[in-house]
């Protein structure tokens, strides 16, 4: 119980398992914060055989999240990445995850042949037509994702308002 799953476009936390069906407390999609909307969705057990089942919490309690931060082409990329990485690494939720993951990664690699060499937050860089896209990638518990993202965005905006970084504006 309480696994976060997705099946047939329904995302939710399993709250009841019965003989013929199971119930999930539905959450919104990633674009809408993946937070509970209060609806209980009854899903027939037959869906397990008809649709792909994504379990967000079976192998690990944490999933990889990505936030896209756009900056202008003339921005100081390395300085901006350093500031954002410091913000992410200082987040209280994210800070403790790599230490907690060591045993989970070892256990999962035995059962699922999953290997992760890098559990710490990282930023990837891509140049688009008129701006630079920084893809900030970090581990987070699915139920804490929105709060963590909110905290990171507030701190990024503070750095922008204090003129320490430049954000791309269309």
Model-derived features: where do they sit?
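Soluble accessory domains appended to multi-pass membrane transport proteins
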Residues: 1-102
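Solvent-exposed, non-transmembrane regulatory segments of membrane-associated proteins
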Residues: 75, 85-86, 93-170
């Amino acid at each position: 119980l309480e696994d976060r799953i997705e099946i047939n476009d329904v995302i939710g936390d399993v709250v009841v398992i019965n003989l013929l069906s199971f119930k999930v407390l539905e959450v919104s999609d990633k674009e809408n914060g993946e937070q509970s909307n209060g609806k209980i969705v009854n899903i027939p057990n037959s869906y397990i055989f008809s649709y792909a089942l994504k379990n967000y919490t079976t192998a690990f309690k944490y999933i990889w999240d990505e936030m896209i931060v756009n900056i202008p082409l003339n921005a100081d990329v390395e300085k901006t990445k350093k500031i954002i990485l410091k913000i992410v690494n200082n987040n209280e939720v994210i800070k403790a995850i790599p230490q907690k993951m060591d045993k989970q990664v070892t256990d999962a690699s035995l059962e699922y042949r999953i290997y992760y060499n890098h559990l710490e937050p990282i930023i990837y860089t891509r140049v688009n037509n008129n701006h630079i896209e920084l893809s900030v990638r970090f581990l987070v518990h699915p139920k804490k994702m929105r709060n963590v993202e909110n905290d990171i965005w507030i701190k990024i905006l503070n750095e922008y308002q204090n003129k320490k970084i430049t954000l791309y504006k269309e």
